[in-house]
Design a protein with these regions (language model features):
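ABC family nucleotide-binding domain
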Residues: 1-157
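Conserved beta-strand-loop-alpha-helix hinge in the C-terminal portion
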Residues: 161-179
Length: 179
């Protein structure tokens, strides 16, 4: 949904998104997809809470902003501006912003890249729990193969091509995974 397909077709949730025009694609991204990028894209003159609230104004089924900020461990930092937050805290604001939209599909590019081990596990648990509770599909792009046991499905890529697909019948809680 970020780029136009150069060939083939892409289906998501029984919808062929390759047939969507530009306006439909914008609506699809706005309503159905949440993004966590490696670069956080926070608005510098908005507080952490306001950055999350801004995203929730674009959708109709948003989650409670204060609850999500608490779940990412930022309840005491929600009134700080991005420049007053560490890189890990900024990453957690970006994650909260994406989750608060309550998207059908959440795409996370290295969501724990700037986080320490303990906070990384906290965020992965939040993603795992949110996926189950909200019936949200969460796709995590990562180089950390140690976390694959938490997943329902693992797709290994090499040189931009899906090389192997593994189905995990019994995903493990992130609480029980060490790396």
């Amino acid at each position: 949904g970020m780029d136009k397909a150069s060939s083939g077709r892409v289906w998501v949730n029984n919808k062929e998104i390759t047939k969507l025009n530009d306006k439909e694609l914008i609506e699809y991204r706005r309503n159905d997809i949440g993004f966590v990028f490696q670069f956080y894209n926070l608005i510098q003159n908005l507080t952490a809470k306001e950055n999350v609230e801004l995203a929730t104004q674009l959708c109709s089924d948003a989650l409670n902003v204060d609850d999500i900020l608490e779940e990412v461990g930022l309840q005491d930092r929600k009134n700080n501006f991005p420049s007053q937050l560490s890189g890990g805290e900024q990453q957690r604001v970006a994650i909260a912003r994406a989750i608060a939209k309550n998207p059908k599909l959440l795409l996370c590019d290295e969501p724990t890249g700037a986080l320490d081990y303990k906070t990384g596990k906290q965020i992965l648990k939040l993603l795992q729990d949110t996926c189950r509770k909200e019936k949200m599909t969460v796709i995590i792009i990562t180089h950390n193969t140690a976390i694959t046991p938490m997943s329902d499905k693992v797709i290994h890529f090499k040189n931009g091509t899906a090389e192997k697909v593994e189905i995990n019948e019994n995903p493990i809680s992130i609480d029980n995974i060490e790396w």
